[in-house]
């Protein structure tokens, strides 16, 4: 377990604060039961827990976070509207398995972009990804190409999409860290967060149906309609996924007080209960354990004080002063173990030049400070 923190703060006459890392020995490892897992503090991007986060794995329907992101970005650009009517085509429905997640949309049926997004994000309907992808890019293949392009733009190093849905296919994979990068971008969209937090949603009759559709969330952390016993206070979405190849997957976030955590759990198992009465879906239980571990063990702590004198730097070419006092431009916090003594942190100052040249104004950058703990930086 490692904690990484980039504090992008310019200091008054000095300093950009660098990486803060706490070694694994600082806290007891929660030993998450999954192929890969990641826990990140949302505001700072601090990695609180990581397990195999760069491994290339099947990710099932967590793929749909990217599919939805592209649609919301298209809406922002004015290329689509939430109230826009879209008609399902035969090509969009072709090749989807009958036993996959579906909203039972048929060829020629018309729904709005908003309704299709709810189908995608609440019940994980596969056909909606193809329908919206075809609408946006002209073909499903073109939409998949755009998914891969966007992944690269977001900095994903271990991701390749072969379809819009997450159905098992050669060349379709991602990693826990890459899914976090995609999710971090998606949650910037308010409507995305509204949809992934929706417990149930009703779609009125369409041109092809006489009855309304009632959608119930697949996410047992926020809804017990499908699975009972997993509700987590403060949980906010985000996306479930499950295939034989991927196992049980879940990307989620949770809020407690002023803190928000984002978790990714991939390749968890479905374990039979000891009494044989059913199964435990460990993507939910392990995510809940991750959240509890993060909230219980970490809190923001101040690592730099804007009023603190860091050091004095010699000044050349000045008749008025021989040194200049170096202070942080602003205070800086980092997400740290609650029981960590901040005085144990090590600060290393690296000056751009050993001597500052006049004239010097308040707020000028003179170098960099790295805050570290133990033997890691």
Give the ranges of each region predicted by the language model.
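Short alpha-helical segments used as structural interaction elements across diverse proteins
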Residues: 1-2, 61, 283
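Domain-terminus/edge residues, biased toward the C-terminal soluble/receptor-binding domains
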Residues: 156-160, 168-173, 177-377
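Hydrophobic alpha-helical membrane context
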Residues: 16-17, 76, 290, 298
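Hydrophobic core
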Residues: 11-20
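Bacterial N-terminal signal peptides that target proteins for export
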Residues: 1-10
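Active-site-adjacent loops and short helices of periplasmic peptidoglycan-processing enzymes
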Residues: 21-177, 181-190, 195
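Polar/charged alpha-helical tracts
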Residues: 5, 25, 145, 343-344
């Amino acid at each position: 377990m490692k904690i990484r923190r980039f504090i992008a703060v310019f200091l008054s006459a000095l300093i950009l604060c660098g990486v803060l890392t706490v070694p694994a020995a600082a806290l007891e490892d929660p030993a998450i039961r999954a192929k890969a897992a990641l826990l990140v503090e949302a505001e700072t991007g601090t990695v609180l827990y990581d397990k195999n986060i760069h491994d290339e794995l099947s990710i099932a329907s967590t793929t749909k976070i990217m599919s939805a992101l592209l649609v919301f970005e298209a809406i922002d650009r004015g290329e689509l509207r939430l109230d826009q009517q879209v008609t399902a085509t035969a090509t969009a429905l072709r090749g989807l398995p009958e036993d996959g997640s579906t909203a039972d949309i048929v060829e020629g049926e018309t729904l709005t972009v908003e309704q299709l997004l709810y189908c995608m994000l609440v019940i994980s309907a596969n056909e909606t990804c193809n329908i919206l992808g075809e609408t946006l890019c002209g073909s499903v293949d073109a939409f998949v190409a755009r998914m891969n392009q966007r992944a690269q733009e977001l900095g994903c190093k271990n991701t390749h999409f072969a379809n819009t849905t997450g159905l098992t296919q050669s060349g379709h994979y991602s990693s826990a860290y890459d899914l976090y990068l995609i999710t971090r971008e998606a949650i910037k969209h308010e409507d995305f967060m509204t949809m992934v937090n929706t417990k149930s949603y009703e779609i009125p009759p369409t041109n092809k149906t006489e009855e309304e559709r009632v959608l119930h969330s697949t996410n047992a952390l926020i809804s017990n309609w499908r699975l009972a016993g997993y509700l987590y206070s403060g949980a906010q979405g985000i996306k479930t996924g499950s295939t034989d190849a991927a196992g049980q997957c879940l990307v989620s976030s949770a809020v407690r007080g002023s803190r928000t955590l984002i978790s990714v759990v991939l390749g968890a198992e479905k374990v039979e209960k000891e009494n044989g009465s059913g199964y435990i879906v460990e993507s939910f239980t392990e995510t809940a354990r991750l959240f509890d571990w993060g909230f219980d063990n970490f809190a923001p702590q101040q690592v730099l004080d804007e009023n603190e004198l860091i050091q004095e730097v010699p000044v050349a070419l000045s008749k008025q002063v021989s040194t200049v006092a170096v202070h942080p431009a602003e205070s800086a916090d980092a997400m740290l173990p609650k029981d960590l003594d901040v005085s144990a942190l090590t600060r290393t100052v690296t000056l751009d030049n050993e001597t500052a040249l006049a004239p010097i104004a308040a707020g000028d950058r003179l170098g960099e400070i790295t805050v570290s703990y133990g033997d890691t930086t």
